[in-house]
Amino acid sequence: MNQMLAAWQGTVTPEMEQVARDEGYPVEPVLQGVAAGTIVIPANMRRKNLKAVGIGTGLRTKVNANIGTSPKQSALDDHRVKLRVALDAGADAVMDLSTGGDLDRCRREILASCPVPVGTVPIYQAAIEAKERYGAIVAMREDELFEVVERQAKDGVDFFTIHAGVTLESLDRLRKQGRLTDIVSRGGSFLTGWMLHNDRENPFYKEFDRLLEICLAYDVALSLGDGMRPGCQADATDRAQVQELLILGELVDRCREAGVQVFVEGPGHVPLDQIIMNVQLQKRLCKGAPFYVLGPLVTDVAPGYDHITAAIGGAVAAMAGADFLCYVTPAEHLGLPTVEDVREGVIATRIAGHAADLVKRVPGAREWDERMSRARKALDWEKQIELAIDPEKARRYHTERNPEKFAGCTMCGEFCAMKLVGEYLGKDYENC
């Protein structure tokens, strides 16, 4: 069932009920949000094993994990392990960004084994197939691009990243203004090369209605990609980025008119003092459409630690109203992430999202922290580990560093503040 069309008719779908249960909400606000386009439930009608996830206003901040093969590393076994680790770490959605090996097989395996929404970037496969077929990405034919879109929709992909805002107009803005890092979006660069070589408009923009027909038929949500996202602090919030956002705002209107669910992607690399303004600008220009941000990374000098730079920016962005955070791993800017990089990226991004949910008073967020505080007050280590966002790491640290199972920890030892104050105040440990 098409989620937005059902919501317009006042029909509550099983997916809406699932989202309401998971969020601790009555179903009516979810129904209203889907109808208005401020909540998106990516759920391809052909998916059989999907646990519906809601993204948008009033809901818990969601986290996406990117996985995928590359031309240098295309082993499916690694891919499967990374998927399992991302899910175990708590990812709410997964994107298959594969560019190496059998792309159809890789995607179909993920869809068959992944219970959460799965997204793709169709231009990747279209570009790679054009290179294999003709020897050059710029030789890609427009019909072949849309054939890939429909093939992936038929497979059950729940949302597409589509760089429809990379237009001849936005490229002209970029060329006139100049940029330090130009275009860092891979999908945006594929389309830019094709457009400039062929001197033609972006097919996704020119034939946007054709794209909407496919998405409507399978209820694939559109994630309007930010091909002009800044790739460094110096390029943040420049004319090219804002020009693309203006176009994306117009495309949001067209998606909603057609009954296609839509959310909007955002930067990128952004200084701390510009993040809130970027979120407010997107929400204003895109009429409350859910905002999906990559980071944003708040400095460019921390390769190896970009899961931290992204978590800092992600917390601020989500606090300001961003709804969906794409994880960044420690391997960002350095290479394909390992299994451990994937786990660390998901956990760091979940921490950022939860920190924002505390501010936004998302149901259950403050209660989680309060339960942890009570467990700490009671020196209840098992409960603390159970409540930790990463129980595995918490247990390992505690076991390794407190082998004698002292009531406190090895940081303070017998001078544990919780223990001492409890004794002086005559309080017993409280069970949480």
From Swiss-Prot:
Listed under catalytic activity are: 5-amino-1-(5-phospho-beta-D-ribosyl)imidazole + S-adenosyl-L-methionine = 4-amino-2-methyl-5-(phosphooxymethyl)pyrimidine + CO + 5'-deoxyadenosine + formate + L-methionine + 3 H(+)
User: Which Gene3D superfamilies does the record match to this protein?
Assistant: 6.10.250.620, Radical SAM ThiC family, central domain
Q: List GO BP terms, alphabetically.
A: thiamine biosynthetic process; thiamine diphosphate biosynthetic process
Q: In its keyword annotation, does this UniProt entry include rRNA-binding? A: no
Which residues does substrate bind? N66, M95, Y124, H163, S185, R186, G187, D226, G227, M228, R229, E265, Y292
Q: How is the cofactor bound?
A: Binds 1 [4Fe-4S] cluster per subunit. The cluster is coordinated with 3 cysteines and an exchangeable S-adenosyl-L-methionine.
Which Pfam family is one of this chain's hits?
ThiC_Rad_SAM
Class of the enzyme per the UniProt entry, highest EC level: lyase
Q: Name one GO molecular function term.
A: zinc ion binding
**Organism domain of life:** Bacteria
NCBIfam families per UniProt: PRK13352.1, thiC
Tell me, what does this protein do in biology? Catalyzes the synthesis of the hydroxymethylpyrimidine phosphate (HMP-P) moiety of thiamine from aminoimidazole ribotide (AIR) in a radical S-adenosyl-L-methionine (SAM)-dependent reaction.
Q: What is this protein called?
A: Phosphomethylpyrimidine synthase
Which lineage? Bacteria, Bacillati, Bacillota, Clostridia, Thermoanaerobacterales
